[in-house]
Curated annotation (Swiss-Prot):
The gene is ric1. Disruption phenotype: ric1-null mutant larvae show micrognathia, small head, shortened trunk, and short, kinked pectoral fins. Craniofacial cartilage elements and newly formed ossification centers are present but they are malformed and smaller than in wild-type controls. Chondrocytes of mutant fishes retain procollagen II intracellularly in large inclusions. The keyword Cytoplasm applies. Keywords: Cytoplasm, Guanine-nucleotide releasing factor, Membrane, Phosphoprotein, Repeat, WD repeat. InterPro entries: Ric1, RIC1_C, WD40/YVTN_repeat-like_dom_sf, WD40_repeat_dom_sf. Residues 945-964 are annotated as: Disordered. GO terms for cellular component: cytosol; Golgi membrane; Ric1-Rgp1 guanyl-nucleotide exchange factor complex. It comes from Danio rerio (Zebrafish). It is found in: Cytoplasm, Cytosol; Membrane. GO terms for molecular function: guanyl-nucleotide exchange factor activity. The RIC1-RGP1 complex acts as a guanine nucleotide exchange factor (GEF), which activates RAB6A by exchanging bound GDP for free GTP, and may be thereby required for efficient fusion of endosome-derived vesicles with the Golgi compartment. The RIC1-RGP1 complex participates in the recycling of mannose-6-phosphate receptors. It is a regulator of procollagen transport and secretion, and is required for correct cartilage morphogenesis and development of the craniofacial skeleton. One of its GO terms (biological process) is intracellular protein transport. It holds the Pfam family RIC1. This is Guanine nucleotide exchange factor subunit RIC1.
Amino acid sequence: MYFLSGWPRRLLCPLRSDERPFRIEPSAQRFYLAVLSETQISIWFSRPSVLIVSYIESGKAAAQFGFYQQVEWKPDDSMIAVAAANGYVLLFDIIGGLDDKYLYEPVYPKGSARVKVTPGYKEEQCAPALTLEMKKPVDLEAPISCLQSLAEDLLVATADGFLHMLHWDSVSNGRRAVNLCTIPFSLDLQSSRGGPCLDLDGVYIRDLEYCATLDGFAVVFDDGRIGFITPTANRLATDQLQGVWAADVTDGTCVAVNNKYRLMAFGCTSGSVLVYMIDSSTGCMQLSHKLELTPKHYPDIWNKTGPVKMIRWSPDCSVAMVTWECGGLSLWSVFGAHLICTLGEDFAYRSDGTKKDPLKISSMSWGVEGYHLWVIRSSDSTVTEEKQEKLQQNTILQFQFIKSSNQEQVLLQGEDRLYVTCGDPTQTQTPGQCRSSSTAPLSQGLSTLLGHKHWQVVQIHSTYLETNWPIRVRNAHDRRRVTLIMLMLTDHYAVCEQNMTVTGGLAWWNDFVVVACYNFIDRQEELRLYVRSANLDNAFASITKLHADTLLLNVFRNMVILFRADCSICLYSIERRHDGPSPSASVELLQEVSMSRYIPHPGLVVSVTLTSVRTESGITLKAPQQACSAESILLNLAGQLIMLQRDRSGPQVREKDAPANHSKLLPFCPPVVLAQCVESVWTSSRSNRKKRHLMEALWLSCGEAGMKVWLPLFPRDHRKPHSFLSRRIMLPFHINIYPLTVLFEDALILGASNETVLFDGLSSSAEPLEALFPYCTVERTSQIYLHHILRQLLVRNLGEQALMLAQSCASLPYFPHVLELMVHVVLEEEATSREPIPDPLLPTVAKFVTEFPLFLQTIVHCARKTEYALWNYLFAAVGNPKDLFEECLMAQDLDTAASYLIILQNMEVPAVSRQHATLLFNTALEQGKWDLCRHMIRFLKAIGSGESETPPTTPTTQEQSPSSGFEFFRNRSISLSQSADSIAAGKFNLQKTMSMPTGPSSKSDSAENLYIDVMLWRHARRLLEQVRLRDLGCFSAQLGFELIGWLCRERTRVARVDDFVTALKCLHKDFLWPFPVIPACTISSPLKNGRCRPVLSSRLLKSQSADSLLNSEMDTTPPQVSTANHRWLDGLGAVSKELDSASSHGGPQTQEAFLSPLISKGEQVSDIYLYFHPSIHPIHLSIHPSIVLFIHSSFYPSIHPSFHPSIHPSIVLSIHPSIHRSIYLSIHPSIHPSIHPSIVLFIHPSIVPSIHPSIHPSIHPLFYLSIHPSIHPSIHRSIHPSIHRSIYPSIHRSIHPSIHRSIYPFIHPSIVLSIHPSIHC
């Protein structure tokens, strides 16, 4: 397919002239182009694009003949015919230069290896020097309307209603003329034997073109009627012509024929192009399709283009370029797929939004191989004379095109480069290899074929292009090997390619390049195989002589299929040989099939393919046998897809001793037509048992009709198929891109599209060409097609087949999107239909989607992306959204349930929404979905605050605007703040988009807040009852719950601990703490004096303070702190290390059983910690501070000093003030540095003097204000740098002399002034 590239080039004419060119016409091979002006004809060369010769008519001759109007080439490029205004036909001979043989010659440096291997070597790389010589003019005595060149004759239509047949040698054979009134016309050829049509009086042919494959002329009359004239014999005579009309067409303007597809394109004054074909049975003109702009894509210009001025088919007949009287260019594929139009988007508008004037074209023509489009701009009457002179030299434009060969890879080819897709080369697979289903990969390599948007550009060397331009790419299955073959051709072009030309194309088989070529030296058609590892030389090639010219070539596994010029098909087998020093291959003819009965002309065959696809009888074969055998031949005959499959009606004879590849091949059945209007065909040479539907299907591109797939139907669970059901079905579907390749297993279509970049940087009076046209690039595109196929199967009541196909593709990453697309497309079509649908498809689609676990997500995502007006229709088919919401809650899919909550909020009254939101909120709290909880809090605060208790009114679906689906959300109080794609990822946001009323609504706001607080309190109580302290802490931190104040209120209710053993067990389990372990030797008796009293080891009994601590009664008055305590604590680290060592050797025992006989009473809670060995206290350092809140105040004095550093300051707030002082006095001074400064605020000043001086650096300076001045002399000098300067004024001056001098640089000067003067020095 064709794509614009870059900016158009401007060709400057070296000869200055006051005349503007107005017509351009290429030669038969398109190497030369004739440019015509009023009295001048010029010949241009295609590559390089240079002027060769120009002929200027004299004034006297111009007055006699009139101005030039039209030009036509002789098929052998030896003559040119020019039609003049006064009815003369001027014939020119084109003669090669005598002295100067070449107009331009390349100059090579000395020593460069440039040798003339074959005749014509330099002619191919240099522009020849030509001259024009006028022959005797022919006077037809009437104005000439059009010219048409034939093989040996020139057909001329005049305004007097005659057709003149002139021989190119006008002297020898004279001329013949036919009056149009004598030609019989009818609607078909079967009834055209009647009398002549009398209504052709005064009518003449405005435009005509000869179609070689139809053997006739497509004509447009001056009254707008169109027709087709065909001769009954080889000679043009009155009794040997007959014609057919096209009914109801009276506005024809021009015509262009497509020889390869046998199509006739007629331009109309309405701006449309009608494409006709000739019915093979009746001979009538049958409308195939239309090429026209649609109001959907071009609402501003679709009916303002004016009449069609010119139509030009590309050299390969695959696309048609159309231009109108009002200007503009538009490109369509052969069967109507629209590709490019310069009347819209960046072509028609500047970057500031102003509209450009469209480019008006007077003539255009395709260049060699379609890489260029030569365009002549028409003169504009509104342009001033000065600007007209400037534009005089810039009237010839050359548009650059790159095109695709429609193969298994996305590969684009330009004039001198290749555009190859980027990806992982390790995932590609050689098409020629026949892998079994067990070893074949399950994918074609998604990352390889998708790659990314960048192209890998392979620049072809200029030395290769000098003799081999233009380049052609055929059957490029592997993008890596395309690059390799181009490098090989560049390196060895002088050795091989100067002796042969490629005629049938290239293909890869394993490591061999298969070439169908013509040998110049032997004058023989050959089939050559070059090994990849050796030079591209005949010495390393396997050569097979052929008996006819090869037109097309293709490879299927170990077979090569050739289509020849005699309309025959040959099958060859290829076998690798290892008998020589280098690898080689042998080629053997297997079968030859004659198609001359079915193919009227060999040029009509577009493609030939071997495939394993069969019709109904072929489905009964086993999958491996069918996938690895060449069962059918597919021919694209002028858009008709014809299949020849092997005849298995008789027994298959095979000798037992013969190898499998020498078995007798079965003959082929008569051909059958599978489809019409086919542009491209894709089949797979691989097999995959898990995806047989996609791998054994046949994929077709049909232009305007979209795509078609010939899908196999398999019985479920290997059951016997029904006799009344077909084994295959043809399913059509539309896509938004032009397909270039099909990824079978990945259910994707890859393509390309033109993207434009505006360039408005130049500000001048004359708008430059770069500003008139945007810069064109080619971007890769892809589209999912699976939902189209599933829908078509459901329409045809093939739900079982659709389910099998969908289940085989359920592992694809975008399969949820496939289901969503299917629901969305069906919903849009049915809900917006103005007529009632007798058998709606949406309920069937909904039932189909329920077979997959993604049903709930699919429905809600589709609803969120659809207009609100269609929701009632959707949920009438899929079910009540309240039921779907409850299903989501039961399935614990809270994110999807939140999306359904948005649906309910818009379809139900606020009370229902609040009820379901409460359910979702409580469930989210239980599961710890804190993001969802925060959104639900905002949702509950906003919902129902300013709305009435009536459901929203559903707008009608009769009249809808493009923005009607979004107006609703702008008026609601809640909407999404993220796209629906983020919901699939598990996150969404609810945002308040309408400001809430103030003033009177404060009561409702407080009620909503109280309602939410009650739910939060209820959840906190539930967590506390279940001793889920970790979840309670996360709950408080994530949702901003005031835990401290709530615990103070609940300390006599739910915060009261009744079963301490169970609470401790839950605590260890919740925080994943191990239970305390002690050596077995340290326990002598579990009970003492009615209480649980463990006997410590001898090492612990050495500490007198520890013994007194164990035997003391638990009361609120702690023992006095002694110096022994300090010594006991210093030895604790060594004791713990010894215990750890003993535990690792002596076998630890858990304390769970040891704790079980404890008496569960609140006043004895402090006893629990007394029985823990001091070595376990470091574990308790990681206990969250909020745990201590539930411990009785009498517990603190008995806690080992090493425990206190982990106590959070907020704990002290909830402890009775009377215990503060007594607790801290008993704490060892070494723990104080870890106490947060805020604790000191609640400590009486008298306790600070007993605190060790090392604690003070960690106390915030502001706390010193509340400390008695008498404490300051004991503060360590090192703490003063951290004291804020505002503290010093309140500190007693007597302290200052003891302050170290090093802290003064940190004290603000204003502080020092208030300090005793004696310290300033």
